């Protein structure tokens, strides 16, 4: 059971029985070894042996203890002093003669202890109960200085499991000697302890040889209230809050070595300022092993463990969070994600809510939770948008398919209309060709029933050209498009005649001509022919006497015959 529950009584009797004014420190260690050597199960079952006083009249070589039931004897090696500093280092060789000097006082129940001469720096293992291995390792896990769980949690756990009290005894939990003072309260949460987790060295009190009584829950609570332990700050390590009740792992049973553990600085002379009258108070840090994260920040007395510096850092973190929120809102506004910073602060969207909570997080656990929520909400919104896009694409595809069907039906309808139109046109063409008559198809003169508006082909009256009469191939062609070989033969007789006339002038064309142009042309044709001069004069005279076209035609036929006879 817990060492704090052992309350020694009859102080005055003890002071009278004390042989000297001051006991050695090794006697206290031997006394604690006798208490710790008892089995945890027997302590929880029968505590009647605690009423009897302790006598150590036998020599230090005997290594027995007798229980009230008369069970077997168990030998226990002595523990070495755990204190750091020059005053607290006591070797095993020194404890032997001091135990012999004090051996005449404790002999009533044949409780014996044995001191073995081990003076090394390694921890000494101890066998509890029936001599089995207690599981004590070489390197204690408590050397790194982690604070243990709360006092009330230990009390409840020890009440439920009395077997663990022996383990705590073997582990070296803090006990208070009768007549001693409680641990000093240096400040709020024990933050100003300045590495006083080391055991303060002091001389032993003369009153520590009293009779042990049966501890009751009320006495245990009184001792626990008096021994208010606080977690200490060892060196430059940060404070670790107490462990959550129910999740605390039971530490291994062990004794620390004589020297200071390797993570703690050696205790200075200021820590051993207790006077000779003040009894030694043995304190041992109860800190969880590495890797155990503690959650609770307040002990049983309700005081906060962390100092005011932590609160200042928290306020500073809140200010940084506010500035980071403003920067994030400004960034989102600049990127065009939101319209204004007010929208970021007042938005009800899950992503914005988790983003604000992540920026306002006070610790990494809350920040991790909010960041996970932000990622999941963003993924959910992205998945929702992807689903919406899929639905939209599906609707577009359906619309395209319907448009294709409509276009196909329209094409078929257009083909039908074209074929009907062509059939109507062919029918109309047949009707117009027959002239609207279906019975008499052999008739030569047909009058069409449908008259199309078309340009009538009128026969153009060809003007008579006298030069055409001599050239059969170039008939009815004007002079301007004739070949050059014929131009040499025709010397433009009209101009030649005018030039030869003495009265020819530009004004002569303005006079009214008594001769028609056709008759004039025919006379020029006769005069330009290769006939003799007499024949030319006879033909010109006969033309002037002609009154009808038939007469002119007959005269010109005669002229042509004469010209042909001459050319042939």
From Swiss-Prot:
Residue numbers spanned by region Disordered: 1-22, 40-320
Annotated segments matching region N0 binding: 33-41
Molecular function GO labels: RNA binding; RNA-directed RNA polymerase activity
CDD domains according to UniProt: MEV_P-protein-C_like (cd21031)
Keywords from the named record: Chaperone, Coiled coil, Host cytoplasm, Phosphoprotein, Viral RNA replication
Chaperone in keyword set: yes
Location, primary (coarse class): host cell
Chain segments carrying region Interaction with the nucleocapsid (N-RNA): 479-568
InterPro entries the record matches: Paramyxo_PProtein_C, PProtein_oligomer_dom1, RNA_pol_Pprot-P_XD_paramyxovir
Region described as L protein binding: 412-445
Listed Basic and acidic residues bias regions: 7-20, 83-101, 150-168
GO CC annotations on file: host cell cytoplasm
Region span, Multimerization: 344-411
PTM text: Phosphorylated by PKC/PRKCZ, and other unknown kinases. Phosphorylation is necessary for viral transcription and replication. The N-terminus contains the majority of phosphorylated sites. Ser-249 is the major site of phosphorylation, but is not necessary for most functions.
Family designation: Belongs to the respirovirus P protein family.
UniProt free text on domains: The N-terminus consists of a long intrinsically disordered tail. The central part contains the coiled-coil multimerization domain (PMD). Forms a four-stranded coiled coil structure. The C-terminus constitutes the alpha-helical domain that binds to the nucleocapsid (N-RNA complex).
Subunit structure: Homotetramer. Interacts (via multimerization domain) with polymerase L; this interaction forms the polymerase complex. Interacts (via N-terminus) with N0; this interaction allows P to chaperon N0 before encapsidation and form the N-P complex. Interacts (via C-terminus) with N-RNA template; this interaction positions the polymerase on the template.
Protein name: Phosphoprotein
Organism: Sendai virus (strain 6/94) (SeV)
């Amino acid at each position: 059971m817990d060492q704090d529950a052992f309350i020694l009584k009859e102080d005055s009797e003890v002071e009278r029985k004390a042989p000297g004014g001051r006991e050695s420190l090794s006697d206290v260690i031997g006394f604690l070894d006798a208490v710790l050597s008892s089995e945890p199960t027997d302590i929880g079952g029968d505590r009647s042996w605690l009423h009897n006083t302790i006598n150590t009249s036998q020599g230090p070589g005997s290594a027995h203890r007798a229980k009230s039931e008369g069970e077997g004897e168990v030998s226990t090696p002595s523990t070495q002093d755990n204190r750091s500093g020059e005053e607290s280092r006591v070797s095993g060789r020194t404890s032997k003669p001091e135990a012999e000097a004090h051996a005449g006082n404790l002999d009533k129940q044949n409780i014996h202890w044995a001191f073995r001469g081990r003076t090394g720096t390694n921890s000494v293992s101890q066998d509890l109960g029936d001599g089995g291995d207690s599981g004590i390792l070489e390197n204690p896990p408590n050397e790194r200085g982690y604070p243990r769980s709360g006092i009330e949690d230990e009390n409840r756990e020890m009440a439920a499991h009395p077997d663990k009290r022996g383990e705590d005894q073997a582990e070296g939990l803090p006990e208070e000697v009768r007549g001693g003072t409680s641990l000093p309260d240096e400040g709020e949460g024990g933050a100003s302890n300045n590495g006083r987790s080391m055991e303060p060295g002091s001389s032993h009190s003369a009153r520590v040889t009293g009779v042990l009584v049966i501890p009751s829950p009320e006495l245990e609570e009184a001792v626990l209230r008096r021994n208010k332990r606080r977690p200490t700050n060892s060196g430059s390590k940060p404070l670790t809050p107490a462990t959550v009740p129910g999740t605390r792992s039971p530490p291994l049973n062990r004794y620390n070595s004589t020297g200071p553990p390797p993570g703690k600085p050696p205790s200075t002379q200021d820590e051993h300022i207790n006077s000779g009258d003040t009894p030694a108070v043995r304190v041992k840090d109860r800190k969880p092993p590495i890797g155990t994260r503690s959650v609770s920040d307040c002990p049983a007395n309700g005081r906060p463990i962390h100092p005011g510096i932590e609160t200042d850092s928290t306020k500073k973190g809140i200010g940084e969070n506010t500035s980071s929120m403003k920067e994030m809102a400004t960034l989102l506004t600049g990127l065009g994600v939101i319209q204004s910073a007010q929208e970021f602060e007042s938005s009800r969207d899950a992503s914005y809510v988790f983003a604000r909570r992540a920026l306002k997080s006070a610790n990494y656990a809350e920040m991790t939770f909010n960041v996970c929520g932000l990622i999941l909400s963003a993924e959910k919104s992205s998945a929702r948008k992807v689903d919406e896009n899929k639905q939209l694409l599906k609707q577009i595809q359906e619309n395209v398919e319907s448009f294709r069907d409509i276009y196909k039906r329209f094409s078929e309808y257009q083909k039908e209309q074209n074929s009907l139109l062509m059939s109507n046109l062919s029918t109309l063409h047949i009707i117009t060709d027959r002239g609207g008559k279906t019975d008499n198809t052999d008739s030569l003169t047909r009058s069409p029933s449908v008259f199309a508006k078309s340009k009538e082909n009128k026969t153009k009256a060809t003007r008579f050209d006298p030069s055409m009469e001599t050239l059969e191939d170039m008939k009815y062609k004007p002079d301007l498009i004739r070949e050059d070989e014929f131009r040499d033969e025709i010397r433009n007789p009209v101009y030649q005649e005018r030039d030869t006339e003495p009265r020819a002038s530009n004004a002569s064309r303005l006079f009214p001509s008594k001769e028609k142009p056709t008759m004039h042309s025919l006379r020029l044709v006769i005069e330009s022919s290769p006939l003799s001069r007499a024949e030319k004069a006879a033909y010109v005279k006969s033309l002037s006497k002609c009154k009808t076209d038939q007469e002119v035609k007959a005269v010109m036929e005669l002229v042509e015959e004469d010209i042909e006879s001459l050319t042939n």
